[in-house]
């Protein structure tokens, strides 16, 4: 006996044989099942993938409280399921259900702030605490500091962008205390290059001022020897002493009283410079270049030396014009040779720098009131070297 559906189909298709009716009914049933499966799949795809519904066959366990999750939605973090209320920071107990990120370490859950505070890679070189990724910092060489920790180790003065500072053993010093530290460790007469070499290459980024202006040492004068009495233009120094040279840069600012750096000359350097000064008081750039090659000194050092020599020469001329008596020892100084008293070298002889190192040099002697020149190869006679 046919059921109700079959009877209804038979009445609708009364003109069709029974075999055809049975095939049509099976096809309709197959299509209805297919449509039901498609509708179920569409409903599943429309749900939130981040918070999937629980399967009624196997309920999940919460990784926080350990209980079953019967809620429609749950959280998935660190490959584990969590109740919405159970996912929180283990330090500050902040609920992380609405946070964009969370961090896990050794099975514990942390918020962003607590994770960086405890496990941050960057640490302040002063307080050794962690530095978060969103925090403003100060960098010096390879060290990183909090803004509040970037202070002078001596006076705790806060250093900001643009301030001058120095570093020693990872400690930060303000400009004044860093200079005091260097003055206490190294003698003040050391040059900047020597000081930088001994201090392990400490860089002083603020040394950009000009040199200090200080008076030189009291001048010493040599008594006349071997019957020669001539104005000594360089009476303040001899071959064994060091001349003072003003430098463009000093290791300390002009506000502090420090000794001027000194440059020492060797015997052959002084002989060459003094011999040329007797010929030309103001060498030009070409002569300075030749002198630099001859002596191994820089053009700047040579310029300063000739400048100092000209100043000393003028002082001696003024002293002689004012009375011709040296106040230091009371010696009478003769007048310098005038322009018409004769040249130091024969008129036909051109003096070059190569002549300055020749053992046969021009000798200046005093005969009555005239200045004569003659050639001498004897080392016992007075040469230009002996005059200074």
UniProtKB/Swiss-Prot annotation:
Main location: nucleus
Annotated region (Disordered), positions in chain: 239-263, 321-356, 369-388
Known DNA-binding region: 267-326
Database matches in Pfam families: Homeodomain, LIM
GO aspect biological process, one term: male gonad development
GO molecular function: DNA-binding transcription factor activity, RNA polymerase II-specific; metal ion binding; RNA polymerase II transcription regulatory region sequence-specific DNA binding; sequence-specific double-stranded DNA binding
Keywords, comma-separated and alphabetical: DNA-binding, Homeobox, LIM domain, Metal-binding, Nucleus, Repeat, Zinc
Domain named LIM zinc-binding: residues: 69-130, 131-193
Low complexity: compositionally biased ranges: 344-356
Regions of compositional bias (Polar residues) in chain numbering: 376-388
GO cellular component terms attached to this protein's record: nucleus
Subcellular location: Nucleus
Gene3D superfamilies in alphabetical order: Cysteine Rich Protein, Homeodomain-like
Quaternary context: Interacts with LDB1 and LDB2.
Protein purpose: Involved in gonadal development.
Record's protein name: LIM/homeobox protein Lhx9
Species assigned in the record: Rattus norvegicus (Rat)
Lineage of producing organism: Eukaryota, Metazoa, Chordata, Craniata, Vertebrata
């Amino acid at each position: 006996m046919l059921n109700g559906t079959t009877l209804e189909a038979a009445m609708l298709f009364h003109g069709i044989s029974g075999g055809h009716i049975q095939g049509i009914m099976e096809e309709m049933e197959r299509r209805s099942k297919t449509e039901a499966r498609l509708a179920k799949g569409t409903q599943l795809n429309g749900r939130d993938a981040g918070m999937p519904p629980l399967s009624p066959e196997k309920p999940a366990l919460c990784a926080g409280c350990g209980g079953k999750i019967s809620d429609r939605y749950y959280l998935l973090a660190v490959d584990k399921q969590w109740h919405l209320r159970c996912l929180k920071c283990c330090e500050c107990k902040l609920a992380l259900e609405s946070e964009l990120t969370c961090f896990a370490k050794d099975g514990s859950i942390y918020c962003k702030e607590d994770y960086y505070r405890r496990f941050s890679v960057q640490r302040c070189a002063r307080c050794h605490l962690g530095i978060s990724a969103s925090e403003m910092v100060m960098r010096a060489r390879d060290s990183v500091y909090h803004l509040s920790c970037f202070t002078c180790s001596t006076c705790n003065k806060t250093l900001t962008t643009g301030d001058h500072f120095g570093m020693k053993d990872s400690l930060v010093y303000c400009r004044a205390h860093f200079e005091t530290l260097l003055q206490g460790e190294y003698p003040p007469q050391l040059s900047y290059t020597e000081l930088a070499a001994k201090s392990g290459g400490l860089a002083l980024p603020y040394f950009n001022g000009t040199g200090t202006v200080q008076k030189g040492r009291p001048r010493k004068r040599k008594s006349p020897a071997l019957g020669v009495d001539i104005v000594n233009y360089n009476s303040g120094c001899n071959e064994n002493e060091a001349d003072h040279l003003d430098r463009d840069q000093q290791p300390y600012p002009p506000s502090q009283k420090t000794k001027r750096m000194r440059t020492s000359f060797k015997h052959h350097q002084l002989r060459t410079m003094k011999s040329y000064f007797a010929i030309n008081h103001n060498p030009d750039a070409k002569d300075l270049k030749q002198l630099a090659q001859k002596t191994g000194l820089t053009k700047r050092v040579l310029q300063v030396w000739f400048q100092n020599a000209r100043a000393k020469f003028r002082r001696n001329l003024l002293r002689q014009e004012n009375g011709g008596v040296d106040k230091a020892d009371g010696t009478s100084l003769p007048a310098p040779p005038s322009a018409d008293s004769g040249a130091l070298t024969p008129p036909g002889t051109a003096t070059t720098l190569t002549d300055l190192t020749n053992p046969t040099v021009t000798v200046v002697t005093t005969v009555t009131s005239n200045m004569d020149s003659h050639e001498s190869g004897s080392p016992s006679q007075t040469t230009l070297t002996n005059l200074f």
